[in-house]
Curated annotation (Swiss-Prot):
PROSITE patterns in the record: IQ (PS50096), MYOSIN_MOTOR (PS51456), SH3_LIKE (PS51844)
Annotated residues for binding of ATP: G194, E195, S196, G197, A198, G199, K200, T201
Originating organism: Mus musculus
Residues of the IQ domain: 807-836
Disulfide bonds: none
Ranges where the record places region Disordered: 1173-1197, 1260-1311, 1597-1629, 1720-1751, 1910-1942, 1967-2000
Protein name (database record): Myosin-14
Compositional bias per record (Low complexity), positions renumbered to this chain: 1981-1991
Region entry Actin-binding, spans: 682-704
């Protein structure tokens, strides 16, 4: 047995199976790089330069050559720039050899590192290869363009192929999962993961497309051979519906985002069910977390769901009218426009409708869906406003509400009432509650979101109903997961948390599947394996989100906060920070300015979350009134999707639509939040995925710009790190990814080792080991476990190829044996036939001998006569027997037919029964096993249930105890309440204690209610457990029938049990809490009992006091009556105060009304003023009317002013009266309060004498106290109201003064406007009569004047502001001078204190210096220690990195060593085979060269032969023509013979000669025909040999061309890249050239316009003559205008001079302030100097210390004051500096404004000069006009020439610019030519290659054409030969007939005169017609015509 050899990687490079479209080849196969290891190749360079990868900021990693290598650092030289760097060795990564460039599987790379993986992906991506294998999964990079690799030809290419036989593709992954499902009978799943915009949705669609094509039922498949594209693939109905479900889901669930134009805003899991044969029998779609908030609100540059834009852009006019649609911009919910054009939206909308129809939706359902979509948009158009006096929301315009109600089938009134004033339940009653605007808006948005989400869920259920036809027929399923990718925005919300949580779980599943389960299986199987920890455990982050308790995660905390009524988002964030603050994956915001509330460290990076409205999103509340209306809608769809809202309060039951039919009603009390529902659905999804065999497709985003052909290395590296690509490749290389059971391995591969295992050997493990030994596999390539055998990557694929080869050899041998057997049997049959023929020949020969023998004849005649007599009888008997036999035969035939049918039926029944029996046996065995497992599981569950029941019993007992305790406490409470009621009338203290006790009792009742609720929950959970137990039992019964789904439900039960255990733990925890609460209640009840004992004691004491007080009752009655009178008087005064307060409030309200009226009048006045201004500007011609209107307005203004003054006076009078009234009320209240105080004192003095009515007196006293407090509060309230009134009066006074000021300003503005109006009117009247040119210039002058006026006003205001600031500065300077003098006076008293202060300061400085020195020394030591520690830490980290790197390199080296050993053995074997093949190939090449030369020589010979044959055929043609001529001559002679009988003899002789000549020609033609046939056979033989040789040469030539094509393809790509760059530059230059051409055209147009103006000026000359007189009249007006302009200019100059003077004054003031500031600085310095001198004097006077201690203290205080004053002075100086800087800035601004004014005045002066010049020109033109028309014409011509000169100058300038642009264009063209030359050079090289290819193809075609010509010539020669033969026979026959005629004529001539009959003439003419027809057939005969169609010879003419 030959050993099985393995390749390096265990995987062959994918060959090209079958014909692949040329357009797709470059996107599937990597181009071959010939001569990799040749001289100068990349392999030599890689080996010589020691190429490595080094980090790069731009490219991620950059190629470099290793120059020097040290222990820690190495020197490298960058390959691109040649720059040298020194880097740490751990930053340098090895480079793979060039032969691994663009590897299809990155597990094949010898150097596995980030740089190599990134380089391989980048090279493949730039080559258009987007799919790459990475070990066991596939990596796909989004190309952002359409690729031709998804056609039907590509699908057929991947169909039935193994992974290593075809290039990487998502089709290959799908095919592998599909085949694994069919072979292993295990459910599969394909998980497309990646970030948003990576291409997950598109790959999911391709997977479904492939499965629909491959696994479609036979009835839906096409006939083979019928071509079809992807769009026209014909499927079955179910497959077509499955494909059409995607456009519907994309329309309703996808939207445009910043990262992706077709982003899935929901997750989906598509489950495709297959039967046993592998055909699709159904499908099911599960969706997760639709982003419903996108329907009402979108971020910037993002859009809503596609269906909105498709509906608005694609609906017809009738549909728009039915759905009440409006343009997109009219909807508030659509903030951004559509992402595509209206035409595309229309096409997409029609596609969506067609998909809905394909899936079986009725037209009514489709219309109802679109109606609901339109209604969602109408929700946003409802506008609500706030009422003026209240916060209640109103709907002023209900148009949108009417549209909404019409679409949803609601009543407008009911909808408005339910929205604005919903009914809420308060106690047992329902009340109407007014909603605020914010609450109503929120309710509208919540309803819109809920409506769209419910519509989406209904649509998914409808699709599942159409797809899931027969759920029980599915044997297995294949699931495709497409869920939203990881999202990291600037601020992320609750939706992003759910999406990222899902991706965390999926990545954890990937890590667990790839790294943990894989290694655990190695350990279970006993394989020697060291567990590798890749550090990719994401469980901490998942626990942070989903952990239920200890500590609770984010979702649990969010649910907990949702239960508290006063909880907010802020409290949630605080609780999260408190519970999870120390979690390693949780971070708080480091900066207070951060907008994020917290951050989570996900596997893809840090994500900042903003917890805004998280509680509302989690609870998802709805307006119950509107929801109930929607449930009762008349629209069927609306009522159906809102079916489950009945009974829901506060929270939306989201699960009802997701898990059951739309009409299912949720259980009451089960309030489920969005987070809980999503967590449960995600748990179900993960359980489903964990039960399947997952296949991962990792989608990568190349860039965020969505540009094709661009790859950002950093972005791709981050995604590769997050996805665990390197770890997956490493475990694929180091591990054993392929495994197979012993029995299956033996059954499948025993064919490779036929004699290795003895017969009857049963041990599977030993059998596999014997097979492995026979296969001679390297021990490093496999491991033998306990039940399986494990292989490295690619080994099983190699064994599979060897098995295929072996099976192929066996089949070939079997076919050879079968063909030999058939050939031998045919040969035996031929031999039998030959012997039979010999016998027949012998008998025939004997018969021939006997037939002429007379006795034999006699015997033959006599013998039948002997049996004649018996013959009839025998015949009759035989006839009867024959009839009987025939009847029997027919009967037996019928019986046999019936029996055969019965046998066939029984056979079918037997096979069916056998198959059923076998299936039943299998099912029975499996069911028995399953029943046993279920029985065991049932026992376990029963134990669990009994335990739960016991616990529930304990809980019930506890609840009963609590109930009894509750009753006891209630009785005790009743006793306490009765006792307290008895004591309440006696003492106020007992009343207060009763209130506190009642509060405690209420608290106890609430606690008891909580306990009851918990008890009810426990009972409900118990019932739930019982229901689940019943469900489990029923499911167990069903599971005995359903064999397939047992393994799936097992894990589901385990998950349920784990949930039960969690719930039991929660119940135990709750029970413990209840016990704690019980103990606390017991303690509190004991305390209450003690308190009650104390209260009883107090009550007894009070009763004793009551007995003592009974004697004093009578004396207290009189005093009580007096107190009642005082109280009545106090109440009366209180009522009077309240009346005064009411009057004050009424006055205040009147004041408010008056103020509002004044404000309204002021606004009306302002509006009338604005209207007046507008009317003044609009009516410039009606000056008198405007004057009257202005006077009228002034009168109104004065009247308003008077009215305002009167109102202010009235207001002052009313305020004075109010003050007096209030003061009187205060006096009265003070007197009353004084009386009350006196009454209180009397009552207190006489309190000891009260006996009888103690309780009543105390009650009255308490009422008096409360009334007093109320009076005090009212007094304070009145005082505060009085203050408010005073403040409001001051405000109104201020407002009145402001209104007066505004009126004054308005009057001033009115006056200025009136003056400006009069000026504008005069100017407008004058300017209206001027020429158009003068109008424009004067208009400019007016604008300049207005700007100068505005500038003057602004300057004046700024000057006033500067003056005010200067005054402020003066005051500050005076204050500073005063402060400085005060400081100087106080400074003298500080000298003694300064010495002591200095001494203390010096001592403290010495102490501080010593401490500072110690601190510096300690800091230096700490710094050195820190530095040492950092160095040690860095060294340790460096050593750790080096250790990890060396460990990794050691692992790689170990793997590489094993592979190299295997490679070495393989290469040695291959080398030997290659040497042998090389020798054979060389010999074959030599033989092929010789054959080619020989064939070329033969070809040349054939060409010569063909030419000679052509010439021979031409000669034959000439001979035939000659014969035809002879025929015609003979026919002419025959006619002459018939016409002339005298010349008969001569004709006979001539005919005889002609016959001989024809016979000679016929014999020559026969010889030529035989020669041509011989040559034709030789030519055919040569053609066959030539075809064989040409095929060999063609194959060799195609191989050569393939190599050249690959090299040319690589070169072509480089050229294409350069060409693209050149095209980009060329486009830029084209744009510049287009701009230049546009400018040129513009100039040309302007030139043409100037020419047209020139011609128009000639025509306008006459009009100028006509207007001359008008101009003379207008000249005077122009002079007046010029004079006015001059006067205004003079005024401007005077104003500017005044401004300059003011500016100079300000500058002088600034200088003076600067001098004062300098003087103050000098004074300050002098004061400091004096202070220093005084300090010295204090130091000298230190001897008299004892006497001056008091002075010292005073000086110290003074010194502190001086220091404070000094600080104030410094602050003042700083303020002065600031003021100075502001002044400098203002001076600068004034300077700029002055310069601007000067420029304006200069412009005005230039305008005036221009006007003067124009006037002079007009005067000159007037003189010239007076001189003559000719002079005027010359002036016009001169003016036009000047304009033309200007135009020419402009044109010249434009021409210069055009020349410059032309230079740029020429430069660009030159560069373009260089690029084009370079491209042409490259193209020339490619053309040379192409020419060589075309020459070879032409040579091949020429040879083929020569062969075809030779064949055609041979066929023509054969046809000519046949034709000549036929003609020869015709001529021969005609000659014979002529001879017969001649002989006949001769005989007749001899007998007598010749007489011709009609028959003779007819025969002669028939002969002529026959000859003519022969000629026609000879002329029209085809080369390939059959020679059998010959005309019959005419019969010889016989005499009548």
């Amino acid at each position: 047995m030959a050993a099985v050899t393995m390749s390096v990687s265990g995987r062959k490079v994918a060959s090209r199976p079958g014909p692949v479209p040329e357009a797709a080849q470059s996107f599937l196969y990597a181009p071959r790089t010939p001569n990799v290891g040749g001289p100068g190749g990349p392999q030599v360079e890689w080996t010589a330069r020691r190429m490595v990868w080094v980090p790069s900021e731009l490219h991620g990693f950059e190629a470099a050559a290793l120059r020097d290598e040290g222990e820690e650092e190495a020197e490298v030289e960058l390959a691109e720039s040649g720059r040298r760097l020194r880097l740490p060795r751990d930053q340098i990564q090895r480079m793979n050899p060039p032969k691994f460039s663009k590897a299809e599987d990155m597990a094949e790379l010898t150097c596995l590192n980030e740089a190599s993986v990134l380089h391989n992906l980048r090279e493949r991506y730039y080559s258009g290869l987007i799919y790459t294998y990475s070990g066991l999964f596939c990596v796909v990079i989004n190309p952002y363009k359409q690729l031709p690799i998804y056609t039907e030809a590509i699908v057929e290419m991947y169909r039935g192929k193994k992974r290593h036989e075809v290039p990487p593709h998502v089709y290959a992954v799908t095919e592998g999962a599909y085949r694994s499902m069919l072979q292993d009978r295990e459910d599969q799943s394909i998980l497309c993961t990646g970030e948003s915009g990576a291409g997950k949705t598109e790959n999911t669609k391709k997977v479904i497309q492939y499965l629909a094509h491959v696994a479609s039922s036979p009835k839906g498949r096409k006939e083979p051979g019928v071509p079809a594209s992807v769009s026209t693939m014909s499927y079955g109905e179910l497959e077509r519906q499955l494909l059409q479900a995607n456009p519907i889901l994309e329309a309703f669930g996808n939207a445009k985002t910043v990262k992706n134009d077709n982003s899935s805003r929901f997750g989906k899991f598509i489950r495709i069910n297959f039967d046993i044969a592998g055909y699709i029998v159904g499908a099911n779609i599960e969706t997760y977390l639709l982003e419903k908030s996108r329907a009402i609100r979108q971020a910037k540059d993002e859009c809503s769901f596609h269906i909105f834009y498709q509906l608005l852009g694609g609906a017809g006019e009738q549909l728009k009218a039915d759905l009440l649609l409006e343009p997109c911009s009219h909807y508030r919910f659509l903030t951004n426009g559509p992402s595509s054009s209206p035409g595309q939206e229309r096409e997409l909308f029609q596609e969506t409708l067609e998909s809905l129809r394909v899936l079986g939706l009725l037209p009514e359902e489709i219309t109802a869906m679109l109606r609901t979509v339109s209604a969602v948009l109408q929700f946003g158009n409802i506008v609500l406003k706030k009422e003026r006096n209240t916060d209640q929301a109103t709907m002023p315009d209900n148009t949108a509400a009417q549209k909404l109600c019409r679409l949803l089938g609601l009543g407008v009134t009911d909808f408005s009432r339910a929205l604005l004033t919903p009914r809420i339940k308060v106690g047992r009653d329902y009340v109407q509650k007014a909603q605020t605007k914010e609450q109503a808006d929120f309710a509208l948005e919540a309803l819109a979101k809920a409506t769209y989400e419910r519509l989406f869920r209904w649509l998914v259920l409808r699709l599942n109903r159409a797809l899931d036809r027969s759920p029980r027929q599915g044997a297995s399923f294949l699931g495709i997961l497409d869920i939203a990718g990881f999202e990291i925005f600037q601020l992320n919300s609750f939706e992003q948390l759910c999406i990222n949580y899902t991706n965390e779980k999926l990545q954890q599943l990937f890590n667990h599947t790839m790294f943990v389960l894989e290694q655990e299986e190695y350990q279970r199987e006993g394989i020697p394996w060291t567990f590798l920890d890749f550090g990719l455990d994401l469980q901490p982050c998942i626990d942070l989100i989903e952990r239920p308790a200890n500590p609770p995660g984010l979702l649990a905390l969010l649910d907990e906060e949702c239960w508290f009524p006063k909880a907010t988002d802020k409290s949630f964030v605080e609780k999260v920070a408190q519970e999870q603050g120390s979690h390693p994956k949780f971070q708080r915001p480091r900066n207070l300015r951060d907008q994020a509330d917290f951050s989570v460290l996900h596997y893809a990076g840090k994500v900042d979350y903003k917890a805004s409205e998280w509680l509302m999103k989690n609870m998802d509340p709805l307006n119950d009134n509107v929801a109930a209306l929607l449930h009762q809608s008349t629209d069927r769809l609306t009522a159906e999707i809102w079916k489950d809202v009945e009974g829901i309060v506060g929270l939306e039951q989201v699960s009802s639509l997701g898990d059951g039919p739309p009409g299912g009603r949720p259980r009451r009390g089960m309030f489920r939040t969005v987070g809980q529902l999503y967590k449960e659905s995600l748990s179900r999804l993960m359980a489903t995925l964990s039960n399947t065999n997952p296949s991962f497709v990792r989608c990568i985003v190349p860039n965020h710009e969505k540009r094709a052909g661009k790859l950002e290395p950093r972005l791709v590296l981050d995604q590769l790190r997050c996805n665990g690509v390197l770890e997956g490749i490493r475990i694929c290389r180091q591990g054993f990814p392929n495994r197979i059971l012993f029995q299956e391995f033996r059954q499948r591969y025993e064919i490779l080792t036929p004699n290795a295992i003895p017969k009857g050997f049963m041990d599977g493990k030993q059998a596999c080991e014997k097979m492995i030994q026979a296969l001679e596999l390297d021990p490093n390539l496999y491991r033998v476990g306990q039940s399986k055998i494990f292989f490295r990557a690619g080994v099983l694929a190699q064994l599979e190829e060897e098995r295929d080869l072996k099976v192929t050899d066996i089949i070939v041998s079997f076919q050879a044996a079968a063909r030999g057997y058939l050939a031998r049997r045919a040969f035996q049959r031929r031999q039998q036939q030959q012997s039979a023929l010999r016998v027949m020949q012998r008998n025939c020969a004997a018969y021939l001998k006997l037939r002429n023998w007379q006795w034999w004849r006699l015997f033959i005649k006599v013998k039948p006569l002997l049996q004649v007599t018996r013959q009839d009888e025998v015949l009759q008997a035989r006839a009867q027997e024959l009839q009987k036999v025939q009847e029997l035969q027919q009967q037996s035939a019928r019986e046999v037919g019936e029996l055969q049918g019965r046998v066939a039926q029984l056979e079918e029944e037997r096979t069916r029964l056998a198959e059923q029996l076998r299936a039943e046996a299998e099912l029975c065995s499996e069911a028995e096993e399953t029943r046993a497992r279920l029985a065991a599981r049932k026992q376990e569950l029963e134990l669990v249930v009994t335990e739960l029941e016991a616990r529930v019993g304990e809980e019930e007992e506890c609840s009963r105890q609590l109930q009894s305790e509750k009753k006891r406490l209630q009785q005790h409470i009743q006793e306490l309440e009765s006792h307290l009621e008895a004591e309440e009338g006696a003492r106020q203290k007992l009343q207060l204690e009763k209130v506190t006790t009642e509060a405690k009792m209420k608290k106890f009742e609430e606690d008891l209610l909580l306990l009851e609720d918990q008890n009810s929950k426990l009972s409900k959970e118990r019932r739930l457990l019982e229901e689940r137990l019943a469900e489990f039992s029923s499911q167990a019964a069903e599971e005995e029938e359903k064999v397939k789904s047992l393994n799936k439900l097992r894990l589901k039960y385990e998950a349920t049990i784990s949930d039960m255990e969690d719930r039991l733990k929660k119940e135990e925890k709750g029970r413990q809490e209840l016990e704690k609460l019980k103990r606390r209640l017991d303690g509190e009840s004991s305390e209450l009992q003690e308190q009650m004992v104390e209260q009883k004691q107090r009550a007894e004491e009070l009763l004793a006091q009551l007995g003592r007080k009974e004697d004093e009752l009578q004396a207290a009655l009189l005093r009580a009556e007096e107190e009642g009178g005082a109280r009545a008087q106090l109440l009366k005064s209180l009522r009077e105060a309240q009346a005064g307060l009411a009057e004050a409030q009424e006055d205040l309200e009147a004041e408010r009304v008056a103020r509002a009226k004044a404000e309204k009048q002021r606004r009306d006045l302002g509006e009338e003023l604005e209207a007046l201004r507008g009317e003044l500007e609009d009516t410039l011609d009606s000056t008198n009317a405007q004057q009257e209107l202005r006077s009228k307005r002034e009168q109104e203004v004065t009247e308003l002013k008077k009215a305002l003054e009167e109102e202010s006076r009235a207001h002052e009078v009313s305020m004075q009266e109010l003050r007096q009234r209030h003061s009187q009320a205060l006096v009265e209240m003070a007197e009353q309060l004084e009386q009350a105080r006196r009454g209180k004192g009397v009552w207190e003095k006489t309190r000891l004498s009260l006996e009888a009515e103690v309780s009543e007196l105390k009650a009255e006293l308490s009422s008096l106290q409360t009334s007093r407090q109320e009076g005090e509060q009212k007094r304070r309230r009145l005082e505060s109201q009085l203050q408010e009134v005073q403040g409001r009066s001051s405000d109104s006074e201020r407002a009145r003064s402001e209104a007066a000021e505004k009126l004054q300003r308005a009057q001033a503005e009115l006056e200025s406007v009136s003056t400006a109006l009069s000026e504008a009117e005069s100017k407008a009247i004058r300017l209206g009569k001027e020429l158009s040119s003068a109008e424009s210039q004067l208009h400019d002058t007016q604008e300049l004047l207005q700007e100068e006026t505005r500038a003057k006003l602004a300057l004046g205001s700024r000057v006033r502001a500067l003056e005010a600031e200067a005054a402020g500065l003066r005051e500050q300077m005076e204050e500073e001078v005063v402060a400085r003098e005060r400081a100087g006076r106080e400074l003298q008293s500080t000298q003694a204190q300064l010495s002591e202060w200095r001494r203390r300061q010096e001592e403290e400085a010495a102490v501080l210096e010593a401490g500072e020195e110690a601190r510096r020394r300690a800091a230096r030591e700490a710094e050195t220690l820190t530095q040492r520690l950092a160095e040690k830490t860095e060294a340790v980290e460096r050593l750790e990195r080096a250790r990890r790197r060396l460990q990794q390199e050691l692992d790689d080296a170990t793997v590489d060593l094993g592979q190299q050993k295997q490679l070495l053995s393989t290469l040695e074997k291959k080398q030997r085979k290659f040497d042998q093949l090389l020798a054979e190939e060389k010999a074959a090449v030599l033989r092929a060269v010789e054959d080619r030369e020989r064939i070329e020589a033969e070809g040349r010979e054939r060409e010569a032969r063909a030419l000679s044959l052509t010439r021979a055929l031409e000669e034959e043609q000439e001979a035939r023509e000659e014969l035809e001529r002879q025929n015609r001559a003979l026919r002419a002679e025959l006619e002459a013979l018939l016409s002339s009988k005298d010349d008969v003899g001569k004709n006979v002789h001539e005919l005889e000669r002609a016959r001989k000549a024809a016979e000679q020609a016929a014999s020559d033609l026969r010889t030529q025909v035989t020669e041509l046939e011989d040559e034709l056979t030789a030519a055919e033989d040569a053609k066959l040999r030539l075809e064989v040789t040409v095929q060999a040469l063609k194959a060799q030539h195609e191989r050569d061309l393939q190599g050249r094509d690959d090299a040319g393809e690589e070169r072509r790509r480089q050229l294409a890249k350069q060409l693209r760059d050149a095209e980009v530059e060329r486009d830029e230059e084209r744009k510049q050239r287009a701009l230049a051409m546009a400018a040129r055209k513009k100039l040309e147009l302007e030139l043409e316009e100037l020419k047209a103006q020139t011609s128009a000026a000639g025509q306008g000359k006459e009009e100028a003559v006509k207007q001359l007189k008008k101009m003379q009249v207008q000249m005077k007006e122009l002079w007046r205008e010029v004079e006015e302009t001059r006067s205004s200019r003079d005024e401007m100059f005077t104003l500017s001079r005044e401004n300059e003077k003011k500016l100079k004054g300000l500058e002088a003031e600034v200088l003076r302030l600067q001098e004062e500031l300098a003087a103050s600085d000098r004074a300050r310095r002098q004061a400091q100097q004096d202070r220093d001198e005084m300090a010295e004097e204090v130091a000298s006077g230190n001897l008299s210390k004892a006497a001056t201690l008091e002075e010292k203290r005073q000086l110290e205080g003074r010194l502190s004051q001086l220091e404070e004053e000094l600080e104030e002075e410094q602050n003042n100086s700083e303020l002065l500096k600031d003021h100075y800087r502001k002044l400098v800035l203002q001076v600068e601004s004034l300077t700029t404004e002055l310069s601007a004014e000067r420029s304006f005045s200069a412009k005005a002066e230039s305008g005036r000069q221009q006007l003067e010049r124009q006037i002079q020109e007009l005067r000159a033109r007037l003189g010239e006009e007076d001189a003559g028309a000719r002079a005027r014409q010359k002036m016009l011509i001169a003016a036009l020439e000047s304009k033309l000169a200007q135009a020419e100058e402009q044109l010249e300038q434009e021409s210069r610019e055009r020349i410059l642009s032309g230079k740029l264009v020429r430069r660009a063209e030159k560069r373009l030519k260089e690029v084009v030359l370079q491209v042409d050079e490259e193209r020339r090289v490619a053309d040379q290659v192409r020419d060589q290819l075309e020459k070879s193809n032409l040579r091949l075609k020429q040879l083929k054409r020569q062969l075809e010509e030779a064949e055609e010539e041979a066929s023509r020669a054969q046809a000519g030969r046949r034709r000549l033969q036929r003609e020869l026979e015709d001529v021969t026959e005609s000659a014979e007939s002529m001879n017969r005629e001649v002989t006949t004529l001769r005989n007749r001539l001899r007998r007598g005169p010749l007489t011709f009959t009609t028959r003779t003439v007819r025969q002669v003419f028939r002969l002529e017609e026959g000859v003519a027809s022969d000629e026609e057939e000879a002329e029209g005969a085809e080369p390939g015509s059959a020679p059998g169609q010959e005309p019959e010879a005419p019969p010889p003419a016989t005499p009548q």
